[in-house]
Design a protein with these regions (language model features):
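N-terminal Rossmann-like NAD(P) cofactor-binding subdomain of oxidoreductases
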Residues: 1-155
Length: 155
């Protein structure tokens, strides 16, 4: 079953998530359905295509209105400051990658759950109230299906 992914915050970490999904050929497992960032689709497409660290993105990237199109996959670009107002239910988002650095507690990150997402992964150290702090390869076996807001420790 394909996991529908949304990214909130399209800085270094958000862009690396996109890069990882495409460069490891995992698009049959993970479908990126939305990016929420204050930058517009054209700017974010450019940042996807050209990276000073990783070089040029090896896939076709274009813009179609408020969508970034990567290899034919349409990714909706949003610019909403309040995560509770995002259309995660409409987009059937399974997991939000919270990459802004602003919503690092369970209380704040749960706004994505309120908006309709099933789970949230915080890309920064989480507050004491997160369900778990998971470092894959170190303690990933502690992750439970009932966890809704987790931190991946740090970017």
């Amino acid at each position: 079953m394909v996991q529908k992914i949304a990214i909130n915050g399209y800085g270094r970490i958000g862009r690396n998530i996109v890069r990882a999904v495409y460069e490891t050929n995992r698009t049959s497992e993970f479908k990126i359905v939305a990016i929420n960032d204050l930058g517009d689709a054209k700017t974010n497409a450019h940042l996807t295509k050209y990276d000073t660290v990783h070089g040029k993105f090896p896939f076709d990237v274009s813009v179609d209105g408020d969508y970034i199109v990567i290899n034919g996959d349409r990714i909706r670009v949003l610019a909403e400051r309040n995560p509770a107002n995002l259309p995660w239910k409409e987009l059937e988002v399974d997991v939000v990658h919270e990459c802004t650095g602003l919503f690092t507690t369970k209380e704040k990150a749960s706004a994505h759950i309120t908006a309709g997402a099933k789970k949230v992964i915080i890309s920064a150290p989480g507050g004491e109230d997160v369900d778990a702090t998971i470092v894959y390869g170190v303690n990933h076996e502690l992750l439970k299906a009932s966890d809704t807001v987790i931190s991946n420790a740090s970017c």
